[in-house]
Each structure stands twice: as C-alpha cells, then as structure tokens.
C-alpha cells in the first residue's frame, strides 16, 4: 500500500533479448549478452506564443511523438548478430577432412585460404608430383599461406593444397536489405528483488553498425539502433501497435 510519499518502484534492468524476423514462422532466438538497451523518443513540438500580453508566454502547445528508437549494445559476436549488423547472411560450414584447394603463391607474401583454422596441410606443385616442406618452402598461418622466396616454390606458382578444417561460421556482408524484426525482452528488475519485466517490440528495423572495432584492448561490442515502426497487423482497439510493457 502506498504511503504519504508514494510507492517505491525504482528500476535497475537486466534480462535476455530474443529476436526473429517479422512474420517468420519460427521461434524467437536469443541475441546473447546485451550490456545496454535504451528506448529513445524524439518529439515534434509546436508552440503558439501569447502575442496579447507584454509578459509573453505560451497560448498553446502541441507535442507529438516523432520517432522511437531501440538502442542495443551486443556483446556476443555470433554469426547472426554480425550479419544483422552488416546487412548480411550467416551460414555454418561443417568440419571437413581432405579438402582440396588451388591457390597462387607469391614470394614473401600472404595467400588467404578458403577456410580458417586449417590443419594437416599438404602443399604440392601444379602437377602433384612435388610435395613442398613446411618451414622451408612455406608456413601455414592462421588463415593463410606464406611462401618463402628462399624455398623451392616459384613466384606466382600454382599450388595444390589438401587440408582439414574445423566447423566455422561465415558471414557475407552487405547482401541483404535491412530486415524487420520482432524483439522481446525477458527481463527482471534488480532493484525490486528480481521481479519479472517483459517488453515486446512488435516491429523494428535496425540500421547497420556504425563503428565495429576489429582490433582493441577491451571486449568488443556491436552497437545497433532500430526504428520502432507501426505494426498494422495489430487491430484490436486499445492495444499498442508499437510496444507492450508488462511488469510485476
């Protein structure tokens, strides 16, 4: 029961976000660790000044919501999160053994390989008759081949490779237009003994990531901002076409 000073209902939010493409026949999948999430509202304000008195002031004012945005700071670099940030597509390549690949090797330079995390690499010439020696003719880097000018491989030679590779995620960037999503927060209020908070964003369209640090000294983040749009599939009177907040 509220006292003379009102009810104490402070808020410190925590929780897990889930997402799915708007209209998809699929469940909402976890986004992962989100270190910050903020709803930002901008307004269009019309002011009518009082021109009838010397003291000034306002005769009337009109405030209309102009835009609503959801800003999120993602900390899990899943392939799906990266794809959303770069308007891309995500896929998984299964682990494989005995994979073959043909590349051109250049002296004292890096040749990228088609897969990452390669092991059990065998490098041969274009006729498959000469097997080159690791550490003398070439070195295997994390995702590429380094050819030594002091070795037996000629500059610009075609090389036949055989190797194994682990399962890996692949993101092809900038191949999709920005998709629309439904986002749900399964949250809690830490300031109120962890009581449940549920927020549903019915229709969001995210923009691309503005700044993605590829090399840094601290944990990385993906900062996304989405526009909250009107969901015309919700037609029941009294129900929001934008978002719904439920809390205990």
Each language-model region and where it sits:
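A sequence-level detector of short linear motifs
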Residues: 30, 131-134, 148
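Mixed-charge, glycine-accented linear interaction segment located at domain edges/termini
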Residues: 126, 142, 148-153, 197-248
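Small/polar beta-strand repeat architecture
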Residues: 149-168
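Beta-strand secondary-structure signal
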Residues: 69-73, 160, 182-184, 223-227
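Extracellular Ig-like/FN3 beta-sandwich strand-entry sites
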Residues: 67, 154-158, 178-180
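Solvent-exposed edge beta-strands and adjacent loop segments
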Residues: 2-84, 137-138, 195-197, 201-222
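Extended beta-strand solenoid/passenger and fiber regions
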Residues: 78-142, 164-199
């Amino acid at each position: 029961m509220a006292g003379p000073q009102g009810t104490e209902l402070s808020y410190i939010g925590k929780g897990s976000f889930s997402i799915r493409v708007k209209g998809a026949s699929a469940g909402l999948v976890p986004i992962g660790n989100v270190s910050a999430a903020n709803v930002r509202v901008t307004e269009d304000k019309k002011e009518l000044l009082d021109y009838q008195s010397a003291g000034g002031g306002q005769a009337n004012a009109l405030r209309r919501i102009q835009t609503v945005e959801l800003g999120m700071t993602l900390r899990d670099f899943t392939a799906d999160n990266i794809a959303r940030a770069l308007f891309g597509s995500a896929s998984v390549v299964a682990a494989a053994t005995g994979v073959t690949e043909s590349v051109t090797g250049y002296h004292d330079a890096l040749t990228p390989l088609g897969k990452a995390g390669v092991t059990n690499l065998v490098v041969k010439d274009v006729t498959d008759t000469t097997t080159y020696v690791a550490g003398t003719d070439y070195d295997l880097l994390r995702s590429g081949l380094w050819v030594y000018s002091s070795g037996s491989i000629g500059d610009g030679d075609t090389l036949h490779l055989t190797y194994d590779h682990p399962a890996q995620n692949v993101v092809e960037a900038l191949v999709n237009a920005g998709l629309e999503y439904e986002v749900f927060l399964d949250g809690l209020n830490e300031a109120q003994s962890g009581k449940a908070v549920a927020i549903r964003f019915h229709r969001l369209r995210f923009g691309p990531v503005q700044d993605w640090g590829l090399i840094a000294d601290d944990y990385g983040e993906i900062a996304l901002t989405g526009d909250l749009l009107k969901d015309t599939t919700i037609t029941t009177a009294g129900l929001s076409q934008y978002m719904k907040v439920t809390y205990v």
